Design a protein with these regions (language model features):
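Repetitive helical segments and hydrophobic/amphipathic motifs
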Residues: 13-14
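Positively charged n-region of N-terminal signal peptides that target proteins for export
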Residues: 1-6
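Beta-propeller folds
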Residues: 9, 18-295
């Protein structure tokens, strides 16, 4: 996709989100489906997905367009795949499994594992709760990886939750209870499950999740760019020990830079960097500061 189309698509996505009621502000999927036509899908919390068509020339928005081959359909789904995502050239799909990042070739169905340290507290390409809820947004469905336009690289966030406090969340649904017949407080990227004898196996359960309250430790974040042809990961030149937030990243049209937004935890300064997928070095692009805070 050329730069003109990228800019048009960005403007269209922003305008549709701004003018529509009850939208999440990020579409869950979008794709060019004609020379001047963009298809978008938005998630609704209670009523499901809704499709739109946007004409890039006239700006006309049409609701309820259903294309014969919905662009979120997949030819197959690898076992355990989470956030299955097409490459821009439609020859591969990326996904996470067991908190590691994978890619699968559509023609051969051959899978390649790209990260290897995923665990209950190390999440590769899958958001820690605070990033899902407060930064990347719920419409991402915890997805924290991004294909390059040339389909040769994937940028991703690696979250270390080991210092984030564990917080219990009660679920009223019986299907969330431990199948063994005991009440169980079980882990959602939290570490170990904890038996709770007074929890009814048919009346609900308690989920333990990594949840940073105000002043608690946030997850440490590293930003990786993996070359899917040779498996090499270049790590962006940021200190993961800094108390900071990274916003939603984006690729340059030439796939030569991965653009990262960074803020300190006080959120009164915003810096934009271009990160090299070759060695992870960063170039400062933009700086903004405000006396209170920046969104």
């Amino acid at each position: 996709m050329n730069m003109k189309k990228c800019l048009i698509a960005l403007v269209l996505l922003m305008s549709v989100a701004a003018s529509a009621k009850d939208f999440n502000d990020v579409p869950s999927a979008w794709k060019w489906v004609g020379k001047n036509e963009v298809a978008l899908t938005y998630d609704y919390s209670f009523t499901g997905d809704k499709d739109f068509s946007v004409n890039a020339v006239t700006g006309k928005v049409t609701e309820g367009i259903n294309y014969p081959a919905k662009f979120t359909d997949f030819p197959f789904r690898p076992e355990g795949a989470v956030n299955l995502t097409y490459s821009p050239d439609s020859t591969k799909m990326a996904f996470t499994r067991d908190n590691n990042l994978w890619v699968v070739d559509i023609a051969t169905k051959g899978e390649t594992q790209l990260t290897f340290d995923g665990s209950d507290v190390i999440l590769n390409g899958y958001s820690s709760w605070v990033y899902y809820e407060e930064i990347l947004g719920r419409p991402t469905h915890y997805c924290a990886f991004w294909w390059s336009p040339d389909s040769k690289k994937i940028g991703f966030y690696r979250f270390d939750n080991s210092e984030v406090p564990v917080f219990p969340i009660y679920s009223p649904f019986a299907e969330d209870a431990d199948r063994s017949g005991m009440g169980l407080a079980y882990s959602q990227n939290a570490g170990a499950a904890v038996a709770l004898p007074n929890v009814s196996p048919t009346g609900g359960s308690v989920r333990m999740t990594r949840y940073p309250k105000c002043g608690d430790n946030n997850p440490k974040v590293r930003i990786g760019i993996v070359n899917i042809q040779n498996g090499f990961t270049a790590w962006a030149d940021f200190d993961e020990n800094d108390d900071q937030y990274f916003g939603t990243p984006f690729w340059g049209a030439d796939s030569e830079s991965f653009y990262i937004q960074r803020e300190p935890r006080t959120q009164n300064t915003l810096d934009l960097y271009a990160v090299s997928p070759v060695d992870g070095s960063k170039k400062h692009i933009y700086h903004e500061t405000y006396k209170t805070w920046l969104d």
